[in-house]
Amino acid sequence: MDSFELLEEKIGYRFKDKNLVKKAFTHISFSKSSENYEVLEFLGDALVNFMTVNILVEAFPNKKEGELSQLKSFLISEEFLASLAKSLNFEKYILISKGEELKGSNKNPSILCDVFEAFWAAIYIDSGYDCKLTKSLFEHHFKSQILEMVNSNSLKQDYKTALQEITQKKWKERPIYNVISVEGPEHRKTFTVECLFKDLRTTGKGNSKKYAEQEAAKNMLQIIQDNEKKKT
């Protein structure tokens, strides 16, 4: 029984090219040649994005584009994709240098996320670029988890996490939050918070600092998404 056979059984897909699945789990510290997951991860990033958006559009045909974009931000985040990888014990299959293994890097959310994306790219390529098959397998394993997250209150409200995931992934920077005013009586205060990122600034108001930050982050997310759309 080869090292990936148990995973293949769990997924319900048998790789024709065993080197391809091995490559999907090979960290650059283990192999600095082209035999690591970096290129597969590049393809897998777009593939997982597409399959996730497809689930959202089919499940919520009446949601506005802005709402779907914000939901997608959570569902393709490093943290969430790493949790999907952990649900299939991906950390057990990662090929990594001894030094990185001692540091526990095989459980690092960033690496788990990369491997998760690379794995789906590997299936897509190995199947002869069969998008229908790849999408069917992905939905079989993760559609219920994705929809469960969409319906959870924590996902709907945590715009700060979504914003930080996007800014760190694309620009390697974090937004900054400042309280700019607190008004009203002690029992009914209104907080105004600004969110700063690069040359952008948004504000949010709420009856707590936390809520005001979420509103400011939500507004910043919308601006960034609008700006990205203008570039395409």
From Swiss-Prot:
GO terms for biological process: mRNA processing; rRNA processing; tRNA processing. It catalyses: Endonucleolytic cleavage to 5'-phosphomonoester. Its cofactor is Mg(2+). The active site is at D45, E117. Keywords: Cytoplasm, Endonuclease, Hydrolase, Magnesium, Metal-binding, mRNA processing, Nuclease, RNA-binding, rRNA processing, rRNA-binding, tRNA processing. PROSITE patterns: DS_RBD, RNASE_3_2. One of its GO terms (cellular component) is cytoplasm. Mg(2+) binds at E41, D114, E117. Transmembrane segments: none annotated. It is found in: Cytoplasm. Residues 158-226 form the DRBM domain. It is an enzyme of class 3 (hydrolase). Residues 4-128 form the RNase III domain. Its EC number is 3.1.26.3. GO terms for molecular function: metal ion binding; ribonuclease III activity; rRNA binding. Digests double-stranded RNA. Involved in the processing of primary rRNA transcript to yield the immediate precursors to the large and small rRNAs (23S and 16S). Processes some mRNAs, and tRNAs when they are encoded in the rRNA operon. Processes pre-crRNA and tracrRNA of type II CRISPR loci if present in the organism. Belongs to the ribonuclease III family. Homodimer. PANTHER family: DICER-RELATED, ENDORIBONUCLEASE DICER. This is Ribonuclease 3.
